UniProtKB/Swiss-Prot annotation:
Protein name: UDP-N-acetylmuramoyl-L-alanyl-D-glutamate--2,6-diaminopimelate ligase
Motif Meso-diaminopimelate recognition motif, residue numbers: 413-416
NCBIfam families named among the record's database cross-references: murE (TIGR01085), PRK00139.1-4 (NF001126)
Pathway assignment: Cell wall biogenesis; peptidoglycan biosynthesis
UniProt record, GO biological process: cell division; cell wall organization; peptidoglycan biosynthetic process; regulation of cell shape
Annotated source species: Neisseria meningitidis serogroup A / serotype 4A (strain DSM 15465 / Z2491)
Residues at which ATP binds: 114-120
GO molecular function: ATP binding; magnesium ion binding; UDP-N-acetylmuramoylalanyl-D-glutamate-2,6-diaminopimelate ligase activity
Length: 492
């Protein structure tokens, strides 16, 4: 699907390997360059990396790859070896993969894409694979690294050179498996070019990022690229999702050598959920699969998490792990941070912090909590919408909150460069009788915790694991989990 560069041996640039690359890394950020590193300079979304070649050279770059668009000229005063490459922006990942010796070829590499569920599935796959004897690296929204020791990241899917540098480091640290969240932006901007995916999961397609993609058709087309990836062996598709069902059928026709596994509650699913129960203690489900039938009971919440478990079962069994072992380890997994994260204090309301920031995700989170809500109790929803993003999503979020919750508190999310009150005003037409409107998110959370009855449930939606709030381009320290903890502590 993607063109490949001339082998580096033919260009005179040595291919690095785990044996000879000590300390020599590739970077597309000049600030990360250290003595002996390689700088990759190409136009970006916000800045032109070629403008930072002098800084990279000053920091000790030993070699520079630069985007040759026919207009840019190398300055001979930059006295380091270099090579211009046409269309480097889209080829940088493949270049970096070759320089590092195609390290992803030596990993069981699993990609997860879809609007919702990427983080949970990726984190669960990593936990499960570790319990099955692997050493699993994670690349995703919550962070990059190994389970329990993730380093914060700014993008769900990093820049192409950064992806390959991460994989190189993971291999040096003994990784045998990598699980990656693959965003639509990452696919569209060629960030995963050069990655050798073995297996891929499609979770669902619901409204998000239309400020970027324009239409749902374009959004879906970008997501589907992952399943036509060169060398992909397994495609795991949610057929409870309308687009997923269409994609699964298309792949079976288009890719005869690709093993396609469908999952869900649907009778047509290969990995089918045939029994499901939910309580405040968690969920239990029976799965019918090509590898046999089995039950899994977990502390996770939500019907959608039974679907996510089915995706994990399909991918792990397709990769050769026995079904009984897979079910055993999945019963032990812990939720990803900020994903249906429950904070319980005796005699106080149950508070659930979740990353739900799309109408579909909010609807499902609220439906899950309605199922376990005590009789006579109220379900609260505290939410906002992000600034400088799809405005059309805002009333849809409001409608989802009104439909699913008994009491709605409208507040801010990450307003970014917008006025928080303008964002709230876009939401309010869909929320005719809010319990509270409070632009200060911390105050809104405290209000819900203080006013809710002891047996009520409160969903704090939108930010999940995030430890900042983006206001006027500045990321201020802010954590829903911390604010909830403080509010519960001081609740009378």
């Amino acid at each position: 699907m993607f063109s490949k560069l001339t082998p580096l041996a033919e260009t005179g640039i040595p291919t690095l390997s785990c044996a000879n690359a000590a300390g020599r890394l590739l970077h597309s950020d000049s600030r990360q360059i250290k003595q002996g590193d390689i700088f990759v300079a190409c136009p970006g979304e916000y800045a032109d990396g070629r403008s930072y070649i002098p800084a990279a050279v000053a920091n000790g770059a030993a070699f520079v790859f630069w985007d040759d668009d026919g207009k840019f000229a190398w300055n001979p005063e930059w006295k380091v070896p270099n090579q211009g490459i046409k269309d480097l922006k889209h080829r940088a990942g493949i270049l970096a993969a070759q320089v590092y010796g195609n390290v992803s070829d030596g990993l069981k590499f699993w990609g997860v894409t879809g609007t919702n569920g990427k983080t949970s599935i990726t984190q669960w796959l990593a936990q499960a694979a570790d319990l099955l004897g692997e050493k699993t690296a994670i690349v995703g929204t919550v962070g990059n690294g190994f389970w329990g020791a993730l380093e914060e990241t700014t993008h769900t899917t990093p820049a192409p050179v950064d992806v390959q540098t991460l994989l190189y480091r993971f291999r040096q640290q003994g990784a045998t498996v990598a699980a990656m969240e693959v965003s639509s932006h990452g696919l569209d901007q060629s960030r995963v070019n050069g990655v050798s995916f073995r297996s891929a999961i499609f979770t669902n397609l619901t409204r998000d990022h239309l400020d970027y993609h324009g239409t749902m058709e374009a959004y879906g087309a970008i997501k589907s690229r992952l399943f036509y990836w060169h060398g992909l062996k397994h495609a795991v598709i949610n057929v409870d999702d309308e687009y997923g069902a269409e994609l699964a059928g298309r792949l079976k026709k288009d890719c005869p050598d690709l093993a396609v596994y469908s999952y869900g509650f649907s009778e047509q699913a290969d990995i089918r959920i045939i029994d499901f129960t939910a309580s405040s203690d968690g969920i239990a489900a029976v799965f019918q699969t090509p590898w046999g039938e089995g039950k899994c009971r977990t502390r996770l919440l939500g019907r959608f998490n039974a679907q996510n478990l089915a995706a994990c079962i399909a991918l792990l069994c397709a990769n050769g792990y026995p079904l009984d072992n897979v079910l055993d380890v999945l019963a032990k997994i812990r939720p990803a941070s900020g994903r249906m994260d429950c904070i319980m204090n005796s005699g106080k309301p149950l508070v659930v912090v979740d990353y739900a920031h799309t109408p579909d995700a909010l609807e499902k989170a609220l439906a899950t909590l309605q199922e376990i809500k005590p009789q006579g109790a109220a379900l609260w929803c505290v939410f906002g919408c992000g600034g400088n993003r799809d405005r059309g999503k805002r009333p849809l979020m409001g409608a989802a909150a009104v439909q699913g919750a008994d009491k709605v508190v409208v507040t801010s999310d990450n307003p970014r460069l917008e006025n928080p009150h303008d964002i709230i005003n876009d939401i309010l037409p869909a929320v005719p009788a809010p319990e509270c409107v409070e632009a200060d998110r911390a105050a809104a959370i405290r209000y819900a915790v203080e006013q809710a009855a002891a047996n009520d449930i409160i969903l704090i939606a939108g930010k999940g694991h995030e430890n900042y709030q983006d206001v006027q381009g500045v990321k201020h320290r802010f954590s829903d989990l911390e604010i909830v903890g403080q509010a519960l502590l001081t609740r009378k």
